[in-house]
């Protein structure tokens, strides 16, 4: 990695601003999955052992950006963080302003302070509208560390503007280094072949960049989820009322033609679990794609023949990257396809298997096979952008490695 590492810093007795990604799922004030908090602990513990004063910065969800909203407060994170650290972690009720400045001033070496959600301020997501927001955050510390891989594809203040104010003092944390090195080495530089990418999710348009980039890298491209029906319609298949992005049909046709000319095999569903409505998961049936999905019915998951087909492709691959569920995994029985993909990846121990964060990571966790996957990324959109472009804005802006 050609960027400054946390190991290159001399943080003893100094204040270090650490951008973490604590954007975790919360229900009724309880954290449902704390993997992103756990993933940041190596960086936090390393700095604590070196007697640094650590100021943690994170976002949570999508608040309006101009006021405090209790639903998006970082308060539920505090007890989890304290459990891992074994000592009290104060939460500043704001991330900027006099209260935050006082909290930072009182922070002693060897202790941790958590600042409230940076997205409560418009200057985080729209730094051009309020440049002073980044300036105030940067003023707290002597060093900056980015350990928030999952949000480093965004040019937000705490990820992109703040590190620019730390010349030769903006470094990558351990999680960031792990993500970049694993994804870079195993998916971009030297993927073992055959290399298969599995992409799910709803829209072709939101993933067209990464799809076209992958066509020059992969041997097989598996397309499913809502996006799969757009490709099927582009091939003149009858998909009933299934989710189709009409504006994505020309893009799908372009991808299919490029894949043909570049020798990449495209795999699409050959059958589907369909129903009139998704909510209850009742009255579903499996239908062949070739025979068509009738009007009034929608496909909500891949069928058993498609599971067998996709599983065979996975088993014949040496590298597999998966991003996006292949069905509505939140509603049984439409979770079976995604869980089957997760279990197939987990059982293929001889391959390099990478799950690109987001919903796919949630499915792997639900299937109980996270530990059997080579690498589960903490960033969905970030992993896709890294595969597409080979870099992320939040990492490119970090200080260069010392020679």
Curated annotation (Swiss-Prot):
The stretch of residues making up the signal peptide is none
Reaction catalysis annotation? (2R)-3-phosphoglycerate + ATP = (2R)-3-phospho-glyceroyl phosphate + ADP
Which BP terms from GO are recorded? gluconeogenesis; glycolytic process
Which superkingdom is the protein from?
Answer: Bacteria
Q: What is its EC number?
A: 2.7.2.3
Which residues are listed for ATP binding in this entry?
A: 207, 299, 330, 357-360
Q: Which pathway does UniProt place it in?
A: Carbohydrate degradation; glycolysis; pyruvate from D-glyceraldehyde 3-phosphate: step 2/5
Q: Per the record, GO CC terms?
A: cytosol
The alphabetical list of record keywords is: ATP-binding, Cytoplasm, Glycolysis, Kinase, Nucleotide-binding, Transferase
Gene Ontology terms, MF aspect: ADP binding; ATP binding; phosphoglycerate kinase activity
Which coarse location class applies to the principal site listed for this UniProt protein? cytoplasm
Name where it's found.
Answer: Cytoplasm
Q: Output the Gene3D superfamilies linked to this UniProt entry.
A: Phosphoglycerate kinase, N-terminal domain
Please tell me where substrate binds in this chain.
21-23, 36, 59-62, 119, 154
Keyword Kinase assigned to the entry: answer is yes
The record's similarity note reads: Belongs to the phosphoglycerate kinase family.
Q: What quaternary structure, including any partners, is listed in this protein's UniProt entry?
A: Monomer.
Q: What is this protein called?
A: Phosphoglycerate kinase
What species was this sequence derived from? Chlamydia muridarum (strain MoPn / Nigg)
Q: What is the lineage of its organism?
A: Bacteria, Pseudomonadati, Chlamydiota, Chlamydiia, Chlamydiales
What is this protein's gene name? pgk
């Amino acid at each position: 990695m050609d960027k400054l590492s946390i190991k290159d810093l001399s943080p003893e007795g100094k204040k270090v601003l650490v951008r973490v990604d604590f954007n975790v799922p919360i229900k009724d004030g309880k954290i449902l999955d704390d993997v992103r908090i756990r993933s940041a602990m190596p960086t936090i513990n390393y700095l604590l052992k070196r007697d640094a004063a650590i100021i943690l910065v994170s976002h949570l969800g999508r608040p309006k950006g101009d006021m405090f909203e209790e639903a998006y407060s970082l308060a539920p994170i505090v007890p989890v963080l304290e459990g891992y650290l074994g000592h009290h972690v104060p939460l500043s009720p704001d991330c900027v302003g006099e209260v935050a400045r006082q909290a930072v001033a009182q922070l002693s070496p060897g202790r941790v302070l958590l600042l409230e959600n940076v997205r409560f301020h418009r200057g985080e997501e729209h730094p051009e509208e309020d440049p002073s927001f980044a300036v105030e955050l940067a003023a707290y510390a002597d060093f900056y560390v980015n350990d928030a891989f999952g949000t480093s594809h965004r040019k937000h203040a705490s990820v992109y503007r703040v590190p620019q104010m730390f010349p030769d003092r903006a470094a990558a944390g351990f999680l960031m280094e792990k993500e970049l090195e694993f994804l870079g080495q195993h998916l971009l530089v030297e993927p073992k072949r055959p290399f298969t990418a599995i992409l799910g999710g709803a829209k072709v348009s939101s993933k067209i960049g990464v799809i076209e980039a992958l066509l020059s890298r992969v041997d097989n491209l598996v397309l499913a989820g809502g996006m799969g029906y757009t490709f099927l319609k582009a091939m003149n298949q009858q998909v009933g009322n299934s989710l189709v992005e009409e504006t994505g049909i020309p893009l799908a046709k372009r991808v299919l033609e490029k894949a043909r000319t570049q020798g990449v095999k495209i795999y699409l569903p050959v059958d589907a679990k369909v129903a009139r409505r998704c909510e209850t998961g009742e009255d579903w049936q499996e239908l062949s794609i070739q025979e068509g999905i009738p009007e009034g019915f929608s496909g909500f998951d891949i069928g058993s023949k498609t599971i067998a087909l996709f599983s065979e492709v996975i088993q014949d691959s040496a590298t597999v990257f998966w991003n996006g569920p292949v069905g509505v995994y939140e509603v049984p029985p439409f979770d079976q396809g995604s869980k089957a993909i997760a279990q197939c990846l987990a059982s293929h121990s001889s391959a390099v298997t990478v799950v690109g964060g987001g919903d796919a990571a949630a499915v792997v966790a639900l299937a109980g096979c996270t530990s059997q996957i080579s690498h589960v990324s903490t960033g969905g959109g970030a992993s896709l952008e890294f595969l597409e472009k080979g870099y992320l804005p939040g990492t490119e802006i970090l200080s260069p490695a010392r020679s």
